Amino acid sequence: MLELPIISITIFLPLISVLYILLFINQSKKANKLNIYVAMVAMLSSVLTFILTIYILIEFDASNHTYQFVERYTWLDKIGLEFHVGIDGIAIFFVVLTSFLTLICIIGSIFTIKKYIKEYLVCFLLMESFCIGAFTAVNLLLFYLFFEAILVPMYIIIGVWGGDNRIYAALKFFLYTFFGSVFFLLALIYIYSKIHSFDLTYILALTENIPLFAQKILWWTIFIAFAVKIPMIPFHTWLPDAHVQAPTSGSVILAGILLKLGSYGFLRVLLPLLPNVSQEFAIYVIYLSVIAIIYSSLVALAQKDIKQMIAYSSIAHMGYVTIGIFSFTETGISGAIFQMLSHGVVSSSLFLIVGTLYERLHTKEIAKYGGVASKMPVLATFFMITMLSSIGLPSTSGFIGEFLSLLGIYKVNVVAACIAALGIILGAVYMLKLYKEVMLGEITNTEIKHFKDLYRYEILSIAPLILIIIYFGLMPNSILNVFHLSVENLLIKF
């Protein structure tokens, strides 16, 4: 391994690029030249960041469950804040996924965003930096700072570049997630008052000394903070509005990365911090997850807007993640992590596909489409593969995560597993219905007759995701083996 502080470089490279764009790119340049220059800097930054994360993945030792590439620097010692970062098997793929999806979003944004492109790309680079920081933070306060900083650029993206109701959606997104943040902050203050440290590797061994009643209150405050982010029912209503109003790239990052921060928080903070209380309250989370799967699937069936349907499907798919996590089985948690990764790729592909349709017809209403496959066979093929993965077809990424999550929960709660399995059937119904109504049949809208198939930049954005969907489905052990020991280590307390 290199002795370079590679995680710090990966976190701060996008931030340095932002500073360069804001401070040193000459504003007097003509708009077209300025946009090209900004796009080149953003593209170079995202490519280099992606290369760095791939290097980390290659050098990562899967036979070691402890944090690797660890860096630790004192920052504000009086309040326990250190720049303490590292990567284990649970975090590694989310770091890679963040850099990969950011690169794809920047490629697409260069060709589709017409106004304030400099500010738009700056927001994506900021989110990339903050997300990587959150996934690698080992200091709990540092995790909180990165976790909450992500709200600002996402709020701006929805509020400035979103649809007609973007202000309402952006405010709703911000208020819901900020509501969860307040609970998390209260939990942090209490933890520090008792343990006088935010170092995760230190406080995990001491939280059992906290009185049981206080542990239970602490558990609920942290749970709510992460449940809002996932989002779990009843904290879910901000997501459909945010997805419908967000631009395509905003929806990709929201579904592909931001939703995963909540479930990652369960794995990184809640379960290891409060293992006994987590087991006690697991049954409530399991049934909330089952309700989310069935309810969201039924609501998705009734949607007339493509993005709203995909948004509700995301809530259902994240339900499989939470039942897997709270099964407290190696199979279930491994399935949950795999499902998080798979959903990140599948949902990103779905939103990019919807984005290509919207660029041509400027509507997300399902009834306005029909017969698109006859004019866009490449898109239809990509859509079919993505759709089949979304419904959990064997040999696709979606099957592995859902199957392992259900198998894990089946070992501890047969009733919950059987009810949750119905969600797969419902998912197949609404996704096949969507594909049929959009892609098949006769062309009833004359504008569709003038559609052209995917442009090169659109193929460049979607094709890698399709390849990953197939690779994950055919070679799941290459992914599962990387975080196997980290999952085993997580379960030691259970």
From Swiss-Prot:
Q: What is the name listed in the Swiss-Prot or TrEMBL entry for this protein?
A: NADH-quinone oxidoreductase subunit M
Give Gene Ontology CC terms.
plasma membrane
Where in or outside the cell it occurs: the entry states: Cell membrane
Task: Return the InterPro entries for the record.
Answer: NADH_Q_OxRdtase_chainM/4, NADH_UbQ_OxRdtase, ND/Mrp_TM
The UniProt family comment states: Belongs to the complex I subunit 4 family.
- Keyword Transferase attributed: no
Q: How does it sit in the membrane?
A: Multi-pass membrane protein
Q: What is its EC number?
A: 7.1.1.-
What GO MF annotations does this protein's record show? NADH dehydrogenase (ubiquinone) activity; ubiquinone binding
The lineage's top-level taxon is Bacteria
